[in-house]
From Swiss-Prot:
AMP binds at D43, R44, N45, Y76, R310. Homodimer; enzymatically active. Interacts with PPP1R3B; recruits the phosphatase PP1 which dephosphorylates and inactivates PYGL/glycogen phosphorylase. SUPFAM superfamilies: UDP-Glycosyltransferase/glycogen phosphorylase (SSF53756). The record marks C109, C143 as: Involved in the association of subunits. This is Glycogen phosphorylase, liver form. Acetylation, which is up-regulated by glucose and insulin and down-regulated by glucagon, inhibits the glycogen phosphorylase activity by promoting PPP1R3B-mediated recruitment of phosphatase PP1 and Ser-15 dephosphorylation. Phosphorylation at Ser-15 converts inactive phosphorylase b into active phosphorylase a. Dephosphorylation of Ser-15 by phosphatase PP1 inactivates the enzyme. Coiled coil: none annotated. It is found in: Cytoplasm, Cytosol. InterPro entries: Glycg_phsphrylas, Glyco_trans_35, Pyridoxal_P_attach_site. The gene is Pygl. It comes from Rattus norvegicus. One of its GO terms (molecular function) is ATP binding. GO terms for biological process: 5-phosphoribose 1-diphosphate biosynthetic process; glucose homeostasis; glycogen catabolic process; glycogen metabolic process; necroptotic process; response to bacterium. Its cofactor is pyridoxal 5'-phosphate.
Length: 850
């Protein structure tokens, strides 16, 4: 059980984690016991640890609701511009500890739970991750919500309340096996259902043209039931809302069709409608054109836009003239950010509402729509770009297809006027692709229908402008921007690495939590040996703690004084976990060749999920686990080298492994990783980076100095040159004896003696269709890794470099990113007002839920 803090520790933490005050603690204990009794209907004799978690969650939630209501009243009174962040993914992780930190309740809660004879850490571990995302894109949305609340922006996250989030990954005999993530099984204390705001969403049907205008009729209706989750800002009394929609069948669903009287079957068929919000599609950077997925995309968009318009009409700006609402002020009151193309149907849907329902002329509707929407691009991989078959859209959303055709016609008219003879340019820029079955290019729809398009790191935004959407940026160069991604320092430092957060606060004060650029002040301590030792001590404590966790959870013993070399992210060929694997085998071979030679001990930790249908990614996991099996059981290797595959990598596991990491692997082929955010988390937590000049690594090197990262391998231009020349994997295989040995071992069954040809698909890919050129960077990577080992032996030099990285990581706060979106795209002003809680929180009748 965690012991209570000493007075000195309390003083040190007072501002960051709140004041412990006797009254606070007494009140929290009272709230806890009240919830145990009245909410959970248990006493201490029969309560389980899960009951205690729920009692604590409800107690903390009590401290949110007044602020939540008060924030919504404040927005209702002041009518600020609102921003709506539309995303099919919100990878939130756990909520309890983050809420305690942002409300300044952590110390008081720790003390209360200790006095109640319970273990806070045990209770925190009971909470399920809200895994409503695959990886970076969904986690970015979660960080952005935290920053928007902390900056006092009137912001709403809108998405889907998936009943099953990203699958739980089990490793059986070295293979990934997926299990359903029934995260709501025990209930979710953080959400509030809002059935009073339930809205209809239409599918199928047909389009009718009448005197009065166009109507979409004979549709199937599914209801969207909103669940609200509070999003607290850091210590500013702002609590914003994430509203997730759940699909419900209407009460008369299918009953009108069953004249025969098969009432039971009609009720059972309600499941078909409700399947829309059943499960998150587990693809990262890959497009799967399934009807259910298209339904999900339209479902979230249709429900959200009705909600946005309802809220606009209820405000003083939604003024009426004789006929209906005047929407001129709409873009001054509403900004909608599309997180990738997944919510792209919002563009034709808003046009449908304006033109068909609100009876606006097309040109007016289009002008308002364009001013309202902005689009963030997240990937340049062609297989990830959404291209929906026209016949599927025609069946599911016939009116939207007509609107998309109309948008495209006007768009192409413009192209033809500007480039009269350039037919190929029209083909390239059309929203409709003709070759191989008609498809709608959703990225093109977004670019045409938005006033701003941004990439997520400088290098990525350049590639977007000069390669992927070159024609569009020639047409409207001012539309294209860069907004380098960021991470929230609340979760990714205060919560996951309290030792480091406190150490920094001792040196520079605690204001850095809301202004991470202040970390540059740490540069003045690079010569302070005592401070460097303290930083190293925090890292060692984190490594020890993680080692104990691994031993308990995975029954693996590792050497906590070895270098922790960590590669955690989705398993994908472009992220090149294979390159890491080849290096592991190379190190193994070197130890075996000369066992007496000194070797810097390493624990290589690789983790991440493979999409269930991605054969190559699953083979990569099997290779890693097979190599681990051989390496970890070779007595000649002993504790010099260990390989761990980290099962079921997720937000709550990232919070454990990142603070314990020495070396962060960011080794995608240059030009393939849009930004990455794991790289930033490692940097902030005192790991050094080995990486290519890709994504945000480029800007990390810019901030810290390239000499303070381990940069290797081809740059974007080198990759292009190699493509032009023709990449011949065999040349590298023949020229590099160590690489040849490694590949031969994999090929001849050294790591799969019972199935010698198990990895033939990997070998075949590496030689004949490796788009990501693993062999081309192998030599540079291995050499760079030798430099890493050398530096690790000089702990003072290593820790100096660590401090330089931490001091340079301030740019990568999502607060900075959101300030840039607010200024350059949304035209909104962050507010540092601490909302007053004085107004009676119970009198907000007309503000409630608005």
């Amino acid at each position: 059980m965690a012991k209570p803090l000493t007075d000195q520790e309390k003083r040190r933490q007072i501002s960051i984690r709140g004041i412990v005050g006797v009254e606070n603690v007494a009140e929290l204990k009272k709230g806890f016991n009240r919830h145990l009794h009245f909410t959970l209907v248990k006493d201490r004799n029969v309560a389980t640890p899960r009951d205690y978690y729920f009692a604590l969650a409800h107690t903390v939630r009590d401290h949110l609701v007044g602020r939540w209501i008060r924030t919504q009243q404040h927005y209702y009174d002041k009518c600020p511009k609102r921003v709506y962040y539309l995303s099919l993914e919100f990878y939130m992780g756990r909520t309890l500890q983050n809420t305690m930190i942002n409300l300044g309740l952590q110390n008081a809660c720790d003390e209360a739970i200790y006095q109640l004879g319970l273990d806070m850490e045990e209770l925190e571990e009971i909470e399920e991750d809200a895994g409503l995302g695959n990886g970076g894109l969904g986690r970015l949305a979660a960080c952005f919500l935290d920053s928007m609340a902390t900056l006092g922006l009137a912001a709403y996250g809108y998405g889907i309340r998936y009943e099953y989030g990203i699958f739980n990954q089990k490793i059986r005999e070295g293979w990934q096996v997926e299990e359903a993530d029934d995260w709501l099984r025990h209930g979710n204390p953080w959400e509030k259902a809002r059935p009073e705001f339930m809205l209809p969403v239409h599918f199928y049907g047909r389009v009718e043209h009448t005197q009065a205008g166009t109507k979409w009729v004979d549709t199937q209706v599914v209801l969207a039931l909103p669940y609200d989750t509070p999003v607290p800002g850091y210590m500013n009394n702002t609590v914003n809302t994430m509203r997730l929609w759940s699909a419900r069948a209407p009460n008369d669903f299918n009953l009108q069709d069953f004249n025969v009287g098969d009432y039971i079957q009609a009720v059972l068929d309600r499941n078909l409608a409700e399947n829309i919000s059943r499960v998150l599609y587990p693809n990262d950077n890959f497009f799967e054109g399934k009807e259910l997925r298209l339904k999900q995309e339209y479902f979230v968009v249709a429900a959200t836009l009705q909600d946005v318009i309802r809220r606009f009409k209820a405000s003083k700006f939604g003024s009426k003239d004789g006929v209906g609402t005047v929407f001129d002020a709409f873009p001054d009151q509403v900004a909608i950010q599309l997180n990738d193309t997944h919510p792209a149907l919002a563009i034709p849907e808003l046009m449908r509402i304006f033109v068909d329902i609100e009876k606006l002329p097309w040109s007016k509707a289009w002008e308002i729509t364009k001013k309202t929407f902005a689009y963030t691009n997240h990937t340049v991989l062609p297989e990830a770009l959404e291209r929906w078959p026209v016949d599927l859209v025609e069946k599911l959303l016939p009116r939207h297809l007509q609107i998309i055709y109309e948008i495209n016609q006007k768009h192409l008219d413009r192209i033809v006027a500007l480039f009269p003879k350039d037919i190929d340019r029209m083909r390239r820029m059309s929203l409709i692709e003709e070759e191989g079955g008609k498809r709608i290019n959703m990225a093109h729809l977004c670019i045409v229908g938005c006033h701003a398009v941004n990439g997520v790191a400088k290098i990525h935004s350049d590639i977007v402008k000069t390669q992927v959407f070159k024609d569009f940026s020639e047409l409207e160069p001012d539309k294209f921007q860069n907004k380098t991604n960021g991470i929230t320092p609340r979760r990714w430092l205060l919560l996951c690495n309290p030792g480091l957060a406190d150490l920094i606060a001792e040196k520079i004060g605690e204001d850095y939590v809301k202004d991470l650029s202040q970390l540059t002040k740490l540069h003045s301590f690079v010569g302070d040996d005592i401070f460097l030792r303290e930083i190293a001590k925090v890292k060692q404590e984190n490594k020890l703690k993680f080692s104990q966790f691994l031993e308990k959870e995975y029954k693996v013993k590792i050497n906590p004084s070895s270098m922790f070399d960590v590669h955690v992210k989705r398993i994908h060929e472009y992220k090149r976990q294979l390159l890491n694997c080849l290096h592991v085998i190379t190190m193994y071979n070197r130890i075996k060749k000369d066992p007496k030679k000194f070797f810097v001990p390493r624990t290589v930790i690789i983790g991440g999920k493979a999409a269930p249908g991605y054969h190559m990614a699953k083979m990569i996991i099997k290779l890693v686990t097979s190599v681990a099996e051989v390496v970890n059981n070779d007595p000649m290797v002993g504790s010099k080298l260990k390989v761990i595959f980290l099962e079921n990598y997720r937000v709550s596991l990232a919070e454990k492994v990142i603070p314990a990491t020495d070396l962060s692997e960011q080794i995608s082929t240059a030009g393939t990783e849009a930004s990455g955010t794991g790289n930033m988390k490692f940097m902030l937590n005192g790991a050094l980076t080995i990486g290519t000049m890709d994504g945000a690594n480029v800007e990390m090197a810019e901030e810290a100095g390239e000499e303070n990262l381990f940069i290797f391998g081809m740059r974007v231009d080198d990759v292009a040159a190699l493509d032009k020349k023709g990449y011949e994997a065999k040349e590298y295989y023949e020229a590099l004896p160590e690489l040849k040995l490694v590949i031969d071992q994999i090929d001849n069954g050294f790591f799969s003696p019972n199935q010698p040809d198990l990895f033939k698909d990997i070998i075949n890919m590496l030689f004949y269709h490796d788009r990501f050129k693993v062999f081309a960077d192998y030599e540079a990577y291995v050499k760079c890794q030798e430099k890493v080992s050398q530096l690790y032996m000089n702990q003072k030099a290593w820790n100096t470099m660590v401090l330089r990285n931490i001091a340079a990581s301030g740019k990568f706060s999502s607060d900075r990113t959101i300030r840039e979106y607010a200024k350059d795209i949304w035209n909104m002003e962050p507010s540092d007002l601490k909302i007053s809680l004085s107004k009676e929180s119970s009198n907000g009748v007309n503000a409630n839920g608005k």
